Amino acid sequence: MVHCSCVLFRKYGNFIDKLRLFTRGGSGGMGYPRLGGEGGKGGDVWVVAQNRMTLKQLKDRYPRKRFVAGVGANSKISALKGSKGKDCEIPVPVGISVTDENGKIIGELNKENDRILVAQGGLGGKLLTNFLPLKGQKRIIHLDLKLIADVGLVGFPNAGKSSLLSCVSHAKPAIADYAFTTLKPELGKIMYSDFKQISVADLPGLIEGAHMNKGMGHKFLKHIERTRQLLFVVDISGFQLSSHTQYRTAFETIILLTKELELYKEELQTKPALLAVNKMDLPDAQDKFHELMSQLQNPKDFLHLFEKNMIPERTVEFQHIIPISAVTGEGIEELKNCIRKSLDEQANQENDALHKKQLLNLWISDTMSSTEPPSKHAVTTSKMDII
């Protein structure tokens, strides 16, 4: 019988993926009642995505976290129409979700130069406002970063995710022979000979209870949401966080990881998934791998070994299972090819689904137009033709 265990964990590093900001649009300019002049509109506040920006840089650059746009120019004899106040642009990284104080989503920034209006400037003084300017909009906004990647690495600490990322890409994450080496998400890119690029996100190792925010689980589980596919990375020799916690076999780690994803957000289980069985250079690795494969072929035959609350509603069906060694390089090329093949298949399926949807919409549109009753003009014309 597999039992649950709990343990205290040290705090993660100073990686920032959430910020709360105060924003205010600029006030409008004064109107000129005697000549009917209109004051300029206050500047607006925008959130703009930039590729090489981080929330930590934003916080360091603007420690007060207050962003106020410029005031509109007053109307005057030499310029009856006042000019608009200067807009304020807040630089943020790509992958930001912007919400208001009530949690309502204002918008998302998924590529460079995407921009969202978060606070409008006030109107300038004009006849409708008795030539008095209006104040700009005040708004508290929350920036929530979710990394965007093709593949997200999922695994317990010390499974070799960082070593794997350094093998398949040019990323240089911190690597050491102890748990929790990775303290913040890392992004790398797999480069192929035909210049195809696939982005991979290495997340800090999950732990049992991550769905309840143990080990800051929510802080890093959310980054999996925007990955197209998941790559489970498990240690063939199993995992034990410390001498005070229970040892887990490779099969048990897969089941427990699946359960953590399910409890955090069920939709994550619907993502296409691959499995990399790491550390195949260790003694007895081949025997353990054959045992793991037999367990994965019929997982339901072994679920009775787990406590009921640890069994996921559905087990993950891996598209590819690849034995690898991030130390010797064994299986790395095969893994890279499987990742690309899986993503290409997913893209083809999405394109086919989109094409079918477009054809269905076209057919519905044609059907509706053919069943519409003829217009009065059409009926009158036909009678005249008969006469």
Swiss-Prot record:
Keywords: Chromosome, GTP-binding, Nucleotide-binding, Nucleus, Ribosome biogenesis. GTP binds at residues 155-162, 202-206, 278-281. The keyword Nucleotide-binding applies. Residues 149-344 form the OBG-type G domain. It holds the Pfam family MMR_HSR1. It is found in: Nucleus, Nucleolus; Chromosome. GO terms for molecular function: GTP binding; GTPase activity; magnesium ion binding; RNA binding. Residues 13-148 form the Obg domain. GO terms for biological process: ribosome biogenesis. The keyword Cytoplasm does not apply. One of its GO terms (cellular component) is chromosome. May be involved in the ribosome maturation process. Complements an ObgE(CgtA) function in E.coli ribosome maturation. Plays a role of GTPase in vitro. When missing, disorganization of the nucleolar architecture is observed. Belongs to the TRAFAC class OBG-HflX-like GTPase superfamily. OBG GTPase family. PANTHER family: DEVELOPMENTALLY REGULATED GTP-BINDING PROTEIN-RELATED, GTP-BINDING PROTEIN 10. This is GTP-binding protein 10. It comes from Homo sapiens. The lineage of its organism: Eukaryota, Metazoa, Chordata, Craniata, Vertebrata. The gene is GTPBP10.
